[in-house]
Amino acid sequence: MEIIKSSRHQRIIGHFGEALLSNWLSRSGFEVTIVDHTGIDIVAYHPVTNQRLGITVKSRTRPKGKEATAVNLLSYRKSKDDRKKVFDACTAFACDPWIAVYVETTVFADIYLTSLRNYDKRYRSRNNLTTDTWKMRAKDLLLYEADPEVKHIRVEFRADSWGW
């Protein structure tokens, strides 16, 4: 089924990615709240491990042929320092900085979750770029799959009778 985005799709998909991740964290024993705060979208606390995560969530929809397009995570353009905003918010809420990426295609969606520390250590470009990205090429997906510090969920879409 072809993806035809509405004028409000980016806002809708953003909320959906946050809600889906919140659901899985809650199912995993975390106390979770979605926050409207510059820098992070979710605060999650795991009472058993005493972990408190401040998560920035990036949600994207990719049409057929664009599934491998990287997701922009943190920008440093024109005095905009998204990384500083994440760290400032995590300081305010006493939590560790994490990143989540939700990407949906015509037939499935993937959600990835890892600490910003793990991202920096294993996946962040060593070049001085204006934007940090989460790569979505096949070789990158294999790296994430092999990394125990990257949490991953795949959701399959099946639309039996959905057409307008």
Each PLM stretch: what is its role?
Residues 1-38, 45-164:
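Mixed-charge (Asp/Glu-Lys/Arg
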